[in-house]
């Protein structure tokens, strides 16, 4: 959606690897109104168009596709793409309609650009899983490549929304990574109770006075359904507010 940063640079780098010497890399930028719920930050979401364009040029992008809203959506639109299982939990529960917007715009972008490969970051793990399911179910002939979460030096996952954080919020937001690592360490030393693990993650996040937890969940990484026992390929996912800024992060317990 723009406001590009070093995590996007990593996506571009991986895309270039898969494109090879004779392939081309396309980047789409579109602040999608369908994936913002009422009262959210759609109007405030950063749109540094010139900076993003220069970013793509310096990164060696061959095509920057930046459509206007009226080019993608008719005023009387009545057709949407909606995944019916993975999108009902985690972010889907907290942000109803969000993934209908994501699937609709991604399907449209796939139809317009017709890529062989598309690259998505694991920070938005649920989005990645839903896009993969959509590609499978709708027979898109596109390979979906997952890229590990890119982080700042202090562990905070890179996000365009990080720039909303004031100094104290930014400092305390590093607790998310610490809490997730706490959960991973517990699993690694034999903890099997999802309740105890998520409780420890919550307690760690609670050490940051400005943190307000939306959810802390242990889920199966394939189905995204909550589980009661820690097992291979479990995922700890968190969503936490710092002031008005909502951040998400996760860690795979492999």
Please name every model-derived segment.
Residues 1-211, 219-223, 251:
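Nucleotidyltransferase catalytic core that binds NTPs
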């Amino acid at each position: 959606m723009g406001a590009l940063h070093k995590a996007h640079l990593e996506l571009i780098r991986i895309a270039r690897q898969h494109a090879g010497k004779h392939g081309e890399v396309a980047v789409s930028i579109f602040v999608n109104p369908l994936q913002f719920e009422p009262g959210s930050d759609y109007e405030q979401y950063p749109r540094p168009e010139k900076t993003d364009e220069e970013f793509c040029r310096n990164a060696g992008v061959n095509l920057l596709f930046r459509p206007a809203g009226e080019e993608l959506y008719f005023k009387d639109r009545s057709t949407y793409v909606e995944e019916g299982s993975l999108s009902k939990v985690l972010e889907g529960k907290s942000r109803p309609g969000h993934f209908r917007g994501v699937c609709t715009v991604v399907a449209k972008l796939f139809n317009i650009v017709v890529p062989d490969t598309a690259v998505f970051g694991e920070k938005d793990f649920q989005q990645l899983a839903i896009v993969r399911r959509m590609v499978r179910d709708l027979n898109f002939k596109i390979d979906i490549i997952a890229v590990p979460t890119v982080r700042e030096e202090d562990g905070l996952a890179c996000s365009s929304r990080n720039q909303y954080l004031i100094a104290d919020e930014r400092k305390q937001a590093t607790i998310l990574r610490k809490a997730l690592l706490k959960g991973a360490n517990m699993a690694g030393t034999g903890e099997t109770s999802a309740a105890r693990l998520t409780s420890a993650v919550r307690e760690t996040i609670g050490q940051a006075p400005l943190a307000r937890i939306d959810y802390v969940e242990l889920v199966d990484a394939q189905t995204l359904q909550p589980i009661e026992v820690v097992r291979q390929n479990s995922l700890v996912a968190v969503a936490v507010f710092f002031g008005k800024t909502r951040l998400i992060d996760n860690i795979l317990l492999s």
